[in-house]
Structure formats: C-alpha cells, structure tokens
C-alpha cells in the first residue's frame, strides 16, 4: 500500500487499486536511503491522493485524533502531556505523523513521542516511568522495536504497569 501511494503519478495513474481496511492517513516513502529513526514524514490523507486522479477505492479507517483528545480532556481535565507509543513499522510511523499533525492544531498540549524507531521496549518502559504528572498515554501500535524485536500483546500490559498512575 505504502509503495503504491509513493509511486510517481505517471507510473500508476491508470491502474485501479482496491484497498481493504487501511488507514485514511499515510506517509509517502522517501526516494533515498535515509535514517528512518530521524525521518519526520508528513501525514497525507488518502482522499487527497484520490483527488489527484489516483484510481483508488475500498474501505479505510479514519482515526479521529481531535475527538480522542477531547475525550481524554473530558475524562481527565487536568491532562497537559500526551504521550504516544508507536513502533518501528510503517503503521507506527504513519500514526505518529498523523497524531503530530493533529495535536499541533490544538493549543495547550505537550506531545511526547515514545518512538519504537529509537527505543526498545525497555527504554520505552523507562520513559513511561519518567512521564510528568498530568500525563496520559495514547497507545498506537507496538509490534516491532528499534532492534527489530517482535512483540505480542502482553508487551502493552508491561508498558501500562510501568507507571500505573498514568491513564492508558
């Protein structure tokens, strides 16, 4: 999916693509070899690509970041710090880009990325322990860390237990 979206328009303009259960947000892959840990891609909306004469159809997820932030503020009104856990995968990178973009539009939020491109699970746990008061954790995706270690669902419980005072 990411490879298709990142192609030059002239190559794929007339090729119909049907997607199933993919995120509406995406990041376009870079042309060159870059250090992925330092890469700060911009989130793009697949609908915008469709409007550029891409032949796209299918089912997409829409992550409503603003609504999630509003819900957190309603449940935990004193929240000032929003930590986002994402892994070292395309899904993690694209979700982090989307959340950064959307949180940047909202005043009064300190965004703390807990990034699996730069950290393994043990570093993330230490960062969670050090979160300031009035923090919450947004759990994006956690499957692959900086060392290409693969994790199953129990890793998220380990992270949540690192700082039980922080809502996750």
Residue ranges and their predicted role:
Residues 1-168:
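Short hydrophobic alpha-helices and adjacent helix-cap/hinge residues
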